[in-house]
């Protein structure tokens, strides 16, 4: 499965806003994992590199960050931005995450890896898991932020149109081989690869109107329906009902709940 949300400029900008909203949670996870100055870290499914830039600043000039993604436009953007930001310790490489890892990466020498919202888009997780296993040294940490229940994305009260949209997204991703509840499968898979789960927590959030997490959900509700309509799985009448429901929510006391995101920190044994 490819990244079904697209790699156009609108999605790039949305990813930037998304990273800002979830930046504190990412940095807290890196603290727990002990990512520090001088480390050599992988950013798996780095996209345009918003997390990579933060990781590069964390490891400093004595460290190294390698972003890996299968979108040529995102890799180009990341490398251009790394040069502009004067981050020579950061570079990105184009890699098919559904294929074998190159020997230059799979050398058992990396100190850690960061992976957020990637596993849910992969039809087959085995190549990624093999890449992680063959890249990290013993004792290295893998930090994952992936969804365990995407259908918790909801609006209360009067969220029928949002619920219909959420169900449409789930079916659309599953039809392309994705798994929006992938975090539930990761413990068994990573245990088989010789990893130990050392820390985990829920990052599910509930938020009122105007809260940054509510704005994040509204941002997605604004940007993604156009692609579902283009793919023929979401109608203009459904979109009109969704927009009316969001407008009503903004004019009343409403509670937004995010998809159930789970943090897992694993150590290679």
Please report, for each region that a protein language model flagged, where it lies by residue.
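A short glycine-rich, Lys/Arg-flanked "PGG" loop and its adjoining helix->strand segment in the class I
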Residues: 126-141
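Conserved catalytic/acceptor-binding region of the Class I
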Residues: 143-211
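A short SAM/SAH-binding and catalytic strip from SAM-dependent methyltransferases
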Residues: 111-126
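Class I SAM-dependent methyltransferase SAM/SAH-binding core
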Residues: 42, 48-102
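Class I SAM-dependent methyltransferase Rossmann-like catalytic core
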Residues: 2-22
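Conserved alpha-helix/loop element of class I SAM-dependent methyltransferases that forms part
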Residues: 20-39, 54
